[in-house]
Amino acid sequence: FHSQKEIYDHLEDQTFSYSGPTSMGKSLLMRIFMKDKILNGFTGNFAILVPTKALITEISSNIVNEDLKNDLSTHNYKVVTSGNSLFLKQNDLNYIMVVTPERMLYMLMSYPNISIDYLFIDEAHKISEADGRSAFYYKVTDMLIQRNRKPKIILASPNIPNPQVYLEALPYNQNASVSYLRTSFTPVSQMKYYLDILNHKFYAFNERATSPDESFFEISGISQHATCFSLIQAIINKDTTKSNIIYCSGRERAVDLARQYAASLPYLNDKKLNALAKEVEDEIHGSYYLADLIKKGVAYHVGYLPLHIRTTIEENYREKNIKTIFCTSTLIEGVNLPADNLFILSYRNGQPNMSPVEFRNLIGRVGRIEYNLYGNVFIIRYSESQSEKKIKELLEKDIPEQKISITSGLNETEKNYIVNQLKNGSTEFTQLSNQNSESYDLMRKVGLILVRDITKDRNSVVRKSFNDYLDNDGISLIKHNFLNTNDDKPKPDDDINVSLDQTQNLIIAIKGGLTYPALKNGKVDYNDLLSFLNKLSRIFRWDMYEKDTVGSNRLRYYAVLLTQWMDGYGLSQIMQQAIDWNKNNYGSVKIHGQLVPYNNSQDHQNIVIGDALGIIENVILFSISNYFLLFSTEYKELVTAGSAFDNDWYEYVEFGSTNPLTIFFQRNGITRDTSDYIRRHHEYYIQTKNGYRLKSDVLSCGKESVEKELKEIQYNVPELFV
């Protein structure tokens, strides 16, 4: 297609920003470009920044399994998805990094000599979001252009009318030669329908209408007895070969609606689906609703599902074994699940309303250039709480021009507050009145970027955005406050997750003798762990900075799950322990926002399982993992002269094990579950002077998920096999 060729020809530009419909295959163009460069002898490093871990898995797997395969080793490339990878310690390799901006920041801090030649920022519209995550884009790009090799930067965004705005997020010296392109061409066709059950009308939407009165035309009435599910079922039954996605506003809603929808459906007795259902029962819990739904060709797709379960569901959906998926905003965030029919039951993304960008990104799931060229979108209004006006606006109105978050996300009061705190010598930013948690997170991280840029004399994007709030005297005062300090007071650094008051508390604690507790018989002791977490809570002031996660009143429960996670328990064991804990400790579950005493019913068990999976994903593997990383990094700096040390609990959290063998295989890119499977099957590995190696027999071990994963690993790490 002409528009794709036009974009492809710009990927060698020094700086290029482009936007187009979700369906045009923007990330596919990046992958084709990288493959072409590598096969033609280019030696250098690529990085793709993506907003979610789900996209890391999808894109890295496509690069390894579809694009390069054995060409990776032939051309001396490794695909890297984490800063813990052993490959980053080798100086003779080329890298394709697929990471989130947060992971990229820690990789750049840990490996100051690594440069990136091509930086692709996928889903670049995230730079517009007024939250703390957008701050990482400013930080990472600024750090990269300070490196020996300045990268070429390519930004890709969906449906944005002004893609050139994201060039404003890049440092000034990166923008000497820039280009941008917007295309509205899509190679796929969509039909959009609005089903108003309350008014009993079925409309088609006309995108070519010249006036609002012509946008919607009624094609039929809707029965007085129709329900949301009866309409969905009637449409699906017209062609049962079609794939269907049903969008819901939240995880609880997606699970509830999936169960209601599947209640009247028969079991399919499909061998592949039954095997997947058995895997869900074995690896999560026998009472978990998802397993029963899968047997009927139905599933739900929510963020807390274990990665390999989620990807296997996606594969079965693409192969049309699973025909209908109920999903949440994980789908908006770029996971490539193509649909013939998309049913939208809410215009909310969690609690807030969907933005026009999110809505266009969502409906872009219908009709995908790699899968199908035609699809239908059905927006269903079935409740008075749904605004007819809002639904029609989302369909009719174009996406407004976007701004970067540093421009639109911070107001004058917030910027003045940041400057005044820095003038007072403090990076302790407290949440302002009427400030939501997302804006507070952005303000705090921007403040930490600003003080670092001022003390380093960097004329960064963030620094320039404060030009109207800082004069020369103010800059001199801030430099004096943060550079003329004694050795005990930390200087500003590149880590925007932690402020100097937190770092100073940590330094004092480590100098005072704080260490990770010793293991007892090779295991983590719950009481020792809880005591250590309480110390970290005071050091890092979680009550102030982490109110919604580790600063909440659930730390004892988090410690229960974390102990089992670090000791290498399987998910099914952890889920059963979580159920038992709630049963034995008079726990409670939240249903529709209300706390209800736990009664050990299957409903309550499923709520506990969902909650526990969410804690592992969002609290243990994100919040707690980050704080343990901070502790370990500072401990190395102060105690071990930068060297690795025994009993590093950050590793135990990150890898979910204290076992060196399991950790070794995960450092080579193998997942926790597969690494643990290998540990339990001695016949599949040997120990050499260079570490553990896998026997080729493991590729036919009989466990499908293990075989599939290790075949991918064999392309990326062939030296791991004997």
Where do the model's predicted regions map?
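N-terminal helicase ATP-binding lobe
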Residues: 1-722
